[in-house]
Amino acid sequence: LRKAETTNADMVIGNRMSETSSMPYIRIAVNKLMSGILSKISGCDIPDSQCGFRLIKRNVLEAIKLESSNYEIESEIIIKAARKGFKIESAPIETVYKGAPSRINPVVDTLRFIAFILKMGTHPIFPKAIKGEK
């Protein structure tokens, strides 16, 4: 909440990437790849695009039409909020893994992410899409 107040951000995403010692290596690699792609597409610095710890102002959610229903929705919100000009920031948070198995499959979900990016027309080979043009 403090980050949103001090930066006037419309959306704040938690950032677990400053302390990754308890994070599985495959998760670090996949997260860095996905976050790098989303940072380029959105024009915002998104160090941890897959973090579910988020603050999203109501007007952001009211302004974007969401179409995804799985983990891609995290990326869809970032892309669409950035295209609408909303301010996106990140805030450091603690990485906590309590031994429970993740429901994320790094291979399958990465492939779904790639398909989602292509579907959105926001692959880096589409420079107009990066700027948010339709």
What are the functions of these language-model segments?
Residues 1-71, 97-114:
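Acceptor/aglycone-binding surface of glycosyltransferases and processive sugar-polymer synthases
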Residues 6, 112, 119-134:
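Terminal low-complexity segments of carbohydrate-biosynthetic enzymes
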Residues 12-14, 48-49, 90, 126-130:
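Short, hydrophobic secondary-structure boundary micro-motifs
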Residues 30, 51, 55-56, 78-82, ...:
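Residue-level signal for alpha-helical context at structural boundaries
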Residues 40, 84, 120, 124:
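Phosphate/oxyanion-binding loops and surfaces in catalytic or ligand/nucleic-acid-binding neighborhoods
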Residues 44-45, 66-69, 78-96:
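Catalytic donor-sugar/metal-binding loop of nucleotide-sugar-dependent glycosyltransferases
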Residues 77, 117:
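Aromatic/hydrophobic pocket-lining residues that form π-stacking "cages" and hydrophobic walls in ligand
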